[in-house]
Structure formats: C-alpha cells, structure tokens
C-alpha cells in the first residue's frame, strides 16, 4: 500500500510513474485531492489510512509520503505484523 501526499498532484503522478508504483496500490481509497484533510494532519491521516488498508487487505508493507513545508518531504515505511 502506498499513501502518497497529493499536495501537488502533477508531481505525485510523475513520481509514481517514474518509480513504477502500481496504480492499484497508490492511494487505494482516494488521496488528498479526492478526500481532503486539514493542514498539519497529513502524517496522522495518511498513516492511519495506510495501516487500515494494510489490515483490510492483509498486506505486509505500507509506504507513506508527506510534505513537511519549505519544500521538504519525509517518508515512512510500515510493516504489518501478522503474529500479534
């Protein structure tokens, strides 16, 4: 599952295409353009969406990308544990 920030939609689409992300794995339940979220809530919202989708599909890894202002960005990779 890949939850990618869409603050700049064209950039997000180009990066996903360049990195070869499968379309069905990127923002599977709609991204920021489709659903929206308040400024400052990106990390919490995208991480929660990613973790819920991993649970729903019994997935193993999730990638979350976020913009953090000033032209900077951050990413986090999560691994769902099946042994809990």
Task: Give the positions of each predicted feature.
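Claisen-condensing/thiolase-fold acyl-transfer catalytic domains that form or cleave C-C bonds
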Residues: 1-84
């Amino acid at each position: 599952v890949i939850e990618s920030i869409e603050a700049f939609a064209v950039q997000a689409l180009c990066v996903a295409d360049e990195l070869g992300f499968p379309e069905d794995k990127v923002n599977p339940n709609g991204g920021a353009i489709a659903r929206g979220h308040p400024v400052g809530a990106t990390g919490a919202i995208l991480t929660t969406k990613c973790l819920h989708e991993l649970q729903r599909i019994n997935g193993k890894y999730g990638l979350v990308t976020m913009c953090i202002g000033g032209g900077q960005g951050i990413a986090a990779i999560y691994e769902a544990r099946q042994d809990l």
